[in-house]
Amino acid sequence: MKAGIHPNYRTVVFHDLSADTYFKVGSTINTDRTIELEGESWPYVTLDVSSASHPYYTGKQKEFSKEGSTARFQQRFGRFFTGNK
């Protein structure tokens, strides 16, 4: 490997703000912020969404049949389409 052309790979602490969860992951992200965690100082990056807070991974997904655009259409105009012709 050539010296000086590769990014600095190191362990970084990612903090999911919405779930208040911390992850230690190897990354090449640049950050000047640090955090004291488990008695050591680590580079620190904040996240809005991660697997700890994303609806797909937490199982708190919305059902399209109840909350989708088709359901909204049925609520607004369903009375006009009662099936009587």
Curated annotation (Swiss-Prot):
Q: Which GO terms describe its molecular function?
A: structural constituent of ribosome
Q: Which gene encodes it?
A: rpmE2
Q: Which InterPro entries match?
A: Ribosomal_bL28/bL31-like_sf, Ribosomal_bL31, Ribosomal_bL31_B, Ribosomal_bL31_sf
Alphabetically ordered keywords of this record? Ribonucleoprotein, Ribosomal protein
An annotated GO cellular component of this protein is: ribosome
What is the taxonomic lineage of the source species?
Answer: Bacteria, Pseudomonadati, Pseudomonadota, Gammaproteobacteria, Enterobacterales
Instruction: Identify its protein family.
Output: Belongs to the bacterial ribosomal protein bL31 family. Type B subfamily.
Its protein name is Large ribosomal subunit protein bL31B
Q: Does the keyword Ribosomal protein apply?
A: yes
UniProt source species: Serratia proteamaculans (strain 568)
Subunit description: Part of the 50S ribosomal subunit.
